Structures are given as structure tokens and as C-alpha cells.
Amino acid sequence: MVGCLGDDEFGARLRAGLAAEGADVAGLRAIPGAVSGLALITVDPAGENSIAVAPGANGLAGAAEVAAAFAEPCDVLVLSAEVPAAALAAALRQARAARVRTVLNLAPVPGEAAALLAEGPDWLVVNAQEAAAVAGQPADGVPDDPARAQAIAASLAKGPAGGQVVVTLGAAGAVLAGPPGTAVVPGFVVTAVDTVGAGDAFVGALAVALASGVDPVAAVTAACAAGAAATTRRGAQEGLPRPADVLAATGFSWPA
């Protein structure tokens, strides 16, 4: 895990929580005088969430974090748009030179989205609203229209990035576009209590599945299962499922 934290109680708690889960936190830099990024999350009775974010130290990630990302060999590099676009672009270039596969999650969509796609991420992951924003199209109705989401994904896959594009559709699953074509990956039926962290679970599971060597459709299927399982548990980090949780919630067995 690479990024910036504030030199505060929240940063200490975040570092300790990640370390307790077995994450290597050597790449987390505490910035003196900075505050850690925070999110205020509300969840409605149906389990849907809304989030207000104060980026804090996330906005200070730069060359040191890019260097830390490549301090050890890796199979897949996951990049979040919650850090400055300049750092993301530098990491994409270095990953390409090192032949490391990249998964770019453009959430939220930055003003530099087009420039980042021009850096050629291997995978782009966005939700329906984000996909429409990146494509310069109206977002109205996209989450409920898989055919339109598929068309947007296909158009993005033919753009500067030229890699695999995934548009997540919540409970409906996801759309995959890229070589050799497009596919709709259905969601898993679960009883959702809290959708916080579902997108994070999706992206993390996708990266792990890709590192295990499965094909794109299988990787997105695993990601859909993990995202669905995350909605059956409350909380953000504490709600992220393990393979046994995914199996219990969805019946999906993690790729061997």
C-alpha cells in the first residue's frame, strides 16, 4: 500500500488497521502538519450510500510515492484517482516501462482523465456515471441501461487507452469491453445492507484475480462476486470480504 497520511490520530489508525490486515504499510508516508484524508458516509435504509470526501494528505502524493510503488516487484499496480493526476501519470509510465499491468480506477473522475487514458492503462474501471463523464456523455439512465453502458465501454476501449474497460452497474453486475470484444457479466443476488466499499472490493478482487492468471471475463466475475459480498456486511474496510465470505454470500468459489 502506497500513499500519504496526515501526521494525526486518523493517520495512525489507518496505518494500524491496514497493518493488522497484513498489508505492507512501508510505502505510507506521514506528512508533518497535514491531515489525513477523510470520508463522511451516509447509508440509507436500502443500503445505498453517499459520500463526502476531504482529500487531505491524499492530495500530496507525488514522486516519493511513485518510487515506493516500484520498490518491490509486483504483478498488478492499482491506481486510484483520489491522488494527483501527475502522480498517476508518472506511475502509469513507469509501470509500462517495467511491464507491470495497471488497473486505473477513475473515481472520482479528474479533469485530466483524457491525459491519463493516453498513458495507456491496461485496465480502466469506472462506474456508470463515471464512464459517461469520461466519455463526455450524459449520465442519466446509464446505470439502468446495460446496452448503453456496453456502448460507452466499447467506445472507451477503442480510445487512447486501448485496453480493457470495465463499467460497473451495481447489483446488475458489470460490462467488459476490450480485446477481443464486449461482454455483460451478471451480478450476484444478495441481500444488501450496506454498499459502502463495494467498489473497492470489486477493484481489489479484480487485481488479485488478474494476478492469479485468469482470463478477463473470469476476473470480472470474481470482482462482481466480491463486490456483491461486500454489500452484505457493514462498514468500509471492515466490510471487505475474504474468499470464505464471498463463497458464503454468493456461492462463488475463488479462482484456484
Where are the regions a protein language model picked out?
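Short gly/ser/thr-rich secondary-structure transition/capping motifs
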Residues: 22, 56-62, 103-109, 185-186
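Conserved N-terminal subdomain of the carbohydrate kinase-like
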Residues: 1-76, 247-256
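Conserved beta-alpha-beta core of the PfkB/ribokinase-like small-molecule kinase fold
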Residues: 74-151, 172-174
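Beta-strand->loop->alpha-helix junctions that form or flank phosphate-binding loops
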Residues: 2-7, 26-36, 105-107, 165-169, ...
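Conserved phosphate-binding/catalytic region of the ribokinase-like
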Residues: 111, 137-256
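Aromatic/hydrophobic pocket-lining residues that form π-stacking "cages" and hydrophobic walls in ligand
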Residues: 14, 90-93, 226
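A generic structural signal for well-ordered alpha-helical segments
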Residues: 18, 95-96, 157
